[in-house]
Structure formats: C-alpha cells, structure tokens
C-alpha cells in the first residue's frame, strides 16, 4: 500500500469514528471528541479515554484504551489487530461500550 493509499484509508477511519461519536451524542451518550492532527481523543463521562491515532511510518492505526494498547494493519480490505486479527471497528465498539457504560457501535 502506498503512503497516499494508507492516508486515505486511515483518514476514512478517523472520519467514521467522528461520525459515530457525533451520532451517539445526539442520543444517550456524552462523549467529548477532540482531534489534534492525526490523533482522536474520546473522553467519556467517567473521565476515561480512548485514543485513536495514525502511525504513518508503520502504516498502522493504534488504539489506546483501558483494555490496553492495540495496533492495526490493513489486511484483505479491513484493519486487523496485528496480534489477534480482531477487526478495528469491532474492537473499538467493545472498548467504547465498556468505558461508556452504554452500548455504542462503530462501523466503517
């Protein structure tokens, strides 16, 4: 994957996360979303955070959550955890639901 392809795919992920948080905030959620360059910080009502950021040199996406730190690479059309193979949006859904205390579903 070229640098240009990586950036397009990775930025699409960040945009999808932003859209999901905006929609969730229209409902029962109160999630603060801050974007600083290629870093998204989601802050939940209980003060816990999830950070999603791009890692261009490695062509990866990273998630930092209470559950730990996770690295994702684009494989066969999806962002997959480099250790477990878990799909990015599925994992983010699990981490955010745990930290928010309310269900929230992330999709591409």
Swiss-Prot record:
GO CC aspect terms: cytosol
Q: Which domain of life is it from?
A: Bacteria
- Any one GO BP annotation for this protein: iron-sulfur cluster assembly
Q: GO MF terms on file? A: ferric iron binding; ferrous iron binding
The entry's keywords: Iron, Metal-binding
Q: What does this protein do?
A: Involved in iron-sulfur (Fe-S) cluster assembly. May act as a regulator of Fe-S biogenesis.
- Recorded family membership: Belongs to the frataxin family.
- Protein's UniProt name: Iron-sulfur cluster assembly protein CyaY
Origin organism is Burkholderia vietnamiensis (strain G4 / LMG 22486) (Burkholderia cepacia (strain R1808))
Question: Which gene is annotated as encoding this protein in its UniProt record?
Answer: cyaY
